[in-house]
Amino acid sequence: MKVSYHGHSVVKIETNGKVMLIDPFLTGNPKTDLKAEDVKVDAILLSHGHGDHVGDTVELAKKNNAVVVAPFELATFLSWQGVKTHPMHIGGSHEFDFGKVKFTQAFHGSSYIDEENKTITYTGMPAGILFTAEEKTLYHAGDTALFSDMKLIGELNNVDVAFLPIGDNFTMGPEDAVLAAKWVQAKTVVPMHYNTFPVIEQDPYQFVEKLQNCTGKVLEAGESITL
């Protein structure tokens, strides 16, 4: 399984001849190396409904006839826009032809904000994502605070790589993320959701230096690891 980081919270997974994108915020993302018009994808996995995570989902899904796997309310909202969806919820899992997806808790918000009409649409509970294929497991925490049940994620799953937000302000910061890494018990930890905007500026190298009992890896946009 090949896993690539593409800035902010964008993660690409290639396995079993399929390509998946998690939280494809491409257009307007100053930290990504991808352009929506160049992306080919079989499935899109969404952690929650905020614009910097849903991003180019509708365009990519329609262009590629890709299924969007998302929390129930968000999946319903996107289905009304003509997107093929598979709704799930916290604690549920499903075996797809590209791998197994399970949604975990995340402590954050989830909504679609229409700036033009000044409306906010509730899009359900935010989630973390566990993805398993080729006997390897990836944990994408989504946007989240530190929470004690991360210990359960570590106890119940053999996590090979965890993508954890470190930006602070909207999510946990580096200090809390160090503890999250300990609780999740991932073999490799990759920081995400930082330096996209001034309010979430962090030094990812200082973060990985503080990690214990795991390998910290800072990935630049376009860099990958193989599990």
UniProtKB/Swiss-Prot annotation:
Source superkingdom:
Bacteria
Q: Which SMART domains match?
A: Lactamase_B
SUPFAM superfamilies, from UniProt? Metallo-hydrolase/oxidoreductase (SSF56281)
Pfam families for the chain: Lactamase_B_2
Indicate yes or no for the key word rRNA processing. Answer: no
The GO molecular function terms of this record are: hydrolase activity
Per UniProt, the keywords (alphabetical) are:
Hydrolase
UniProt family annotation: Belongs to the UPF0173 family.
PANTHER family for this protein:
UPF0173 METAL-DEPENDENT HYDROLASE MJ1163, UPF0173 METAL-DEPENDENT HYDROLASE MJ1163-RELATED
Task: Give the HAMAP family listed for this entry.
Answer: UPF0173 (MF_00457)
Protein name in UniProt: UPF0173 metal-dependent hydrolase BCQ_4418
